[in-house]
Structures are given as C-alpha cells and as structure tokens.
C-alpha cells in the first residue's frame, strides 16, 4: 500500500477533477489520504478559476486577433496622485494568448507578489517600454498632459512597434489605432501587464528617493500624502522631487517665499 506521502506526490500529476484516479483513491479510508484528495481537488479548481479569469481578461485582445492584429500594446500609468516623484507609464506587448498566472490590476495584486509577477511579465513579454516624466515637467504642463507624455515615451521604446494600443482610460494623439478602456487594468491582460511594470518601476524609484531624502517615508508611501509624509513636509520642507503645483506643497512653497 502506498504511503500518504507517495499519494500526495502522485496527486500533483492529476490535472482533472473528473479523473478516475480520484474515484479509486476515495476507496482508501485513511483520513490523511482523503485530506490530500480534497486538497488536490481545491488546487485544480483554483487553477480552473484562474484560467477562466485570465481568459476573460483577454477579450479585447481576442477581438483584435480576429482582425489579424497580434502586436497589441497595453498602456498604463502609475503616480498621478502623489505629492512627490514622477509619473511612470509602461507599454507592454505580450505574445498572442499569453496568460501569466496571478496577473491582474496591480492594485489587486498582494504587495509581496509584485516583484514575482513583474519578473514574469519581463520574461514573457515581446517588448516593454517605460516612460518617466519628472515632477518639474508635471508642474509645467499639468499631470494629465504629463501622463500622456509618459505614455508616448513608453510606446516609442517598443520594438517592434505595436499595431494597436489598449489604453487605460486615455486617448493619445498617435498614428496608431487604439482602444480606451475604463478600468482597463482590471479588464485587459495587456494593460494589467503595463500596470505592474509601471508600479514596480515607480516603487523602486521612490525607494531610491527615500535614501536621498530621508524623513518623508517615500519607500512606504510612494510619494502619496500620508501622515508621515505631511509630517516630513512640515518639519523638513519641500524637496527637489516635490510637485510644487500640488497642494499642500504649493502653499508651503508660497509661504516660504512670502516669509
């Protein structure tokens, strides 16, 4: 009779819930065996559910595949709302029908999984472009225009160039056909891939800024206006990476000039 450990190792090879192997093993009345059967069935169901989720997030891409298009770039940005740091956009072309387990809107991915999924996108993407527009340009042209500049920069880095763009809630003045999708990072795998690339890239930049400008908690808050960040602004003042067109930074700068 096989040991429970041997059965556990064997069950990993079973891929279907209807497999006759389960029926056979269910005759074994050892509680440990029954526990391993239940565990493996849950794992198979989770894999099926994940595959269905990923399939549903390929609906926009599949419509474009039907039109004979394969070089489809997902575009997304991170960093519109922070008081400090750049806005970062990413453009990602995935291979046809590419499914990356766990890939989702970056806001829905557990932080501990960010780097793992970022690496999976890096490994499986046909091409990746990243656009970074700093706080000075944001202050000059406004955050909406800066976001478009970041996206255009990211797209310009792609090789090969895309045949179609899937963009998260934005239209770009480019001679490439495009689809603007509301909540695109939750509805398109290509945009979700761009979302995690932009997120990890920006988070890593803010960790570097945290070393340069301690006291604002940039490594944790990514430049957003948390209590620790606002406390740092009050105690230490404005840094070269702060957006002086954003409140309360703007008022602090004006107050300093007036005094």
From Swiss-Prot:
Manganese or magnesium. Binds 1 divalent metal ion per monomer in the absence of substrate. May bind a second metal ion after substrate binding. The lineage of its organism: Bacteria, Bacillati, Bacillota, Bacilli, Lactobacillales. Keywords: Cytoplasm, Endonuclease, Hydrolase, Manganese, Metal-binding, Nuclease. Its EC number is 3.1.26.4. This is Ribonuclease HII. It comes from Streptococcus pneumoniae serotype 4 (strain ATCC BAA-334 / TIGR4). A divalent metal cation binds at residues 76-77, 168. It comes from the Bacteria. Endonuclease that specifically degrades the RNA of RNA-DNA hybrids. Its cofactor is Mn(2+); Mg(2+).
């Amino acid at each position: 009779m096989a040991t429970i450990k041997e059965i556990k190792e064997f069950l990993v090879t079973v891929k279907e819930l209807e497999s006759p192997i389960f029926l056979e093993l269910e005759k074994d009345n050892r509680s440990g065996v029954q526990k391993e059967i239940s565990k493996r069935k849950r794992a198979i169901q989770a894999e099926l559910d994940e595959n269905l989720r990923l399939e549903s997030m390929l609906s926009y891409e599949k419509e474009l595949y039907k039109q004979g298009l394969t070089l489809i770039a997902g575009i997304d940005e991170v960093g519109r709302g922070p008081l400090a740091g750049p806005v970062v956009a990413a453009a990602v072309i995935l291979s046809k029908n590419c499914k990356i387990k766990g890939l989702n809107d970056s806001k829905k991915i557990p932080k501990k999984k960010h780097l793992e999924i970022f690496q999976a996108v890096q490994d499986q993407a046909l091409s990746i472009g990243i656009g970074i527009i700093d706080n000075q340009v944001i202050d000059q042209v406004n955050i909406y225009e800066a976001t478009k500049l970041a996206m255009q920069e990211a797209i310009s880095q792609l090789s090969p160039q895309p045949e179609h763009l899937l963009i998260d809630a934005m239209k770009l003045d480019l001679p490439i056909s495009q689809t603007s999708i509301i909540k695109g990072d939750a509805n398109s795998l290509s945009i979700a891939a761009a979302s995690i690339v932009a997120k990890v890239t920006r988070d890593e930049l803010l960790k570097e800024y945290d070393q340069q400008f301690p006291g604002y908690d940039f490594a944790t808050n990514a430049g957003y206006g948390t209590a620790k960040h606002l406390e740092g602004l009050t105690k230490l003042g404005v840094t070269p990476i702060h957006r002086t067109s954003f409140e309360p930074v703007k008022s602090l700068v004006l107050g300093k000039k007036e005094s």
